[in-house]
């Protein structure tokens, strides 16, 4: 099973509509590739990876199964995340409450058009067991 499917299985439980992955460890696990900077949103049917111009080419080349979108001054992470969650009617967004700073949480909580649901334990769980 691809790692991204493990995260989709979490969404299928019905506690959240999508996942917001901000930590490098979980972004790398979901994508099965390391992009130095970015944010990922995992929805039931589609996965998004948002990054800036420095990493966009590598992300587009190495993240099959993700819709890769470039951030810039006119298209900050919060706007792009809102576009993605609106396209999938996301009301509740599970996030990594153990790794966001207060500043990041405040930004996402005030700018995103979804209720943030602390979900670190569930998001981290797939990384805790190795597959052969």
What are the roles of these predicted feature ranges?
Residues 2, 76-132:
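Flexible, acidic/His-enriched mid-domain "rim/lid" segments that flank
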Residues 1-83:
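N-terminal accessory/capping or targeting/presequence segment of soluble
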